[in-house]
Amino acid sequence: MNKADRYSIGIALSGGGFRGMAHIGVLRALEQHAMKPDLIAGTSAGSLVGALYASGKSATDIESLASKIFWPKLLGSHALADFCRDNLPCTFAELAIPLCVVVTALPSKQPVVFDSGELVPAIIASCAMPWLFRRVKIGDSIYTDGGWACVLPARVCRERGCKKVISSDVWWRASVAKRSGFSTNGRFANYAYSRQYMEALNKSDVVINPQIHAAGMLPGRRGMRSLIRSGELAANETLRHP
């Protein structure tokens, strides 16, 4: 059986920092529509939420777990590693749903996809925002935040043979990217960054864009609930009118 036969629905979860909590609501809506992913690809915050879901937890389980966390404490590699080890299996092979984790290789700044071996180091590397985390060494290579090279990993799902790709997009620059397209008018760090994002949208069959309000920008229980609700509302609306 080839990969195209194995994977019907692929879910791509974007990076976006704390805004990534909206992915939980998106996953809950997918459950309500009886749409179980056969493959999950995640970048940065999307890799963490995706890993929790791929481990067999429901969206409600993940929300319950997230509600017990003082989120500012996770803004460091040691705390994040402890959280992952407490709540995730050791290896990709132990996951209930196949998972792809996107990281950025240094110094090349090219995307690298982990889908086997140890799980926690890959998650930490994918979430390693440069201004908050140290770079992560895996084997002989150095990695950082996956969002640098691939903020929305729809291409990963497509390359793995998924027949339908549903993308949950909480990237904070998304609205600017869609307005300016491939322009280099100073709104983006570089042309390649906006291009890879727009290509990801083109690889998606369905794109869910949670509308994130001010309450959802702040780390904390109130912000988390607002984000999850925004993800659920956006997903239900999009899935009803694809």
Model segments located where?
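Patatin-like phospholipase
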Residues: 1-43, 51-242
